[in-house]
């Protein structure tokens, strides 16, 4: 009886460990992908950078993209 309980606990531990590793290995978002609803999912060398959209001075939305860290983007006319 003790052997059955011990075996069950070991199997439960193994399954829990596998599930935890699978959650940590979620695919990351590559450069220029939208991250508005998932700001922490950009790949490690990228950052989720957000920009507000305005029309007639009023904000109408927000866009977020995975961009390189430390890079400054400027608007071209």
From Swiss-Prot:
InterPro entries: Spider_toxin_CSTX_knottin. It comes from the Eukaryota. Pfam families: Toxin_35. Coiled coil: none annotated. Residues 21-26 form a propeptide. Residues 1-20 form the signal peptide. GO terms for molecular function: toxin activity. One of its GO terms (cellular component) is extracellular region. Keywords: Disulfide bond, Secreted, Signal, Toxin. It is found in: Secreted. Expressed by the venom gland. Belongs to the neurotoxin 19 (CSTX) family. 08 (U8-Lctx) subfamily. This is U8-lycotoxin-Ls1m. It comes from Lycosa singoriensis (Wolf spider).
């Amino acid at each position: 009886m003790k052997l059955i309980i011990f075996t069950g606990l070991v199997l439960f531990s193994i399954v829990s460990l596998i599930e935890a590793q699978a959650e940590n290995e979620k695919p990351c978002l590559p450069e220029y992908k939208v991250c508005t609803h998932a700001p922490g999912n950009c790949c490690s060398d990228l950052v989720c950078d957000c920009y507000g959209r305005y029309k007639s001075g009023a904000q109408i939305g927000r866009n977020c993209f995975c961009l390189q860290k430390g890079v400054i983007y400027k608007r071209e006319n």
